[in-house]
Amino acid sequence: MWVSPSRIIRLRRAGAWRDFRDHRIITRVAEHSNPSPPSPPLCDVLASLRAATAEQHARLDQAMPLSGSTPTLDDYRDHLLILRAWLAPLERWLARFGDGPQDAARLPSVPRASLLEQDLAHPAMPSGGMAVDEIDVATLRGDAAYRWGVCYVIEGSQLGGAVLYRQLSRQLAPHPLDYLGAGKTPGPRWQQFLQALRANVQEPADIALACAGAQRTFNDLLARVPACASSGTR
């Protein structure tokens, strides 16, 4: 998860820098701790995905409702409303497939939209919030490589969720933050995903498709964040 210098300053002021630093260490260890194939592809899909989405990731990191220095439950509600409009239709669309990242033998399915609904319905959650239109999945490509890129963004979002849970679980109590808490230990799942991604997306054409899927997925999310939507997405 890319983090700007200003975000680092805010984390330090909030006393959460150690949590974030630990998260970065866990993430890197998760990516590299298990043995890898002796000769990785010359064109690495993970490096390509990171480069293709770095700008979008940076913009999103600054603009989501929970990115402020003192988030409230109102901010968490709006955060979930944005994610629901993005994630729920994506999960329904991905459920139509049984190959690529949707092959349960490669990566077991982990539905997350139901946790969003559960958190939104919790008695501690303030009522109201913004109206957010669901993304349009009709023009998404069905290629397996493209879906690997889509899932790269979805799976990666759980890493940030783990950091947010550690930062906010006390601050936003008594709300349990079940959606964020579901990713408290994302390392093993993320490692499993990366191994499957690298094993199945190696050809340059497939890597390009994965990057296109990831960029589209980021753009669909950015378009639902008021601070980004007002300035347009690229």
What are these language model-derived features?
Residues 2-13:
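Low-acidity, Ser/Thr- and Arg-rich intrinsically disordered low-complexity segments
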Residues 1-2, 29:
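Compositionally biased, low-complexity segments
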Residues 19-234:
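Metal- and O2-centered redox machinery and metal/ROS homeostasis
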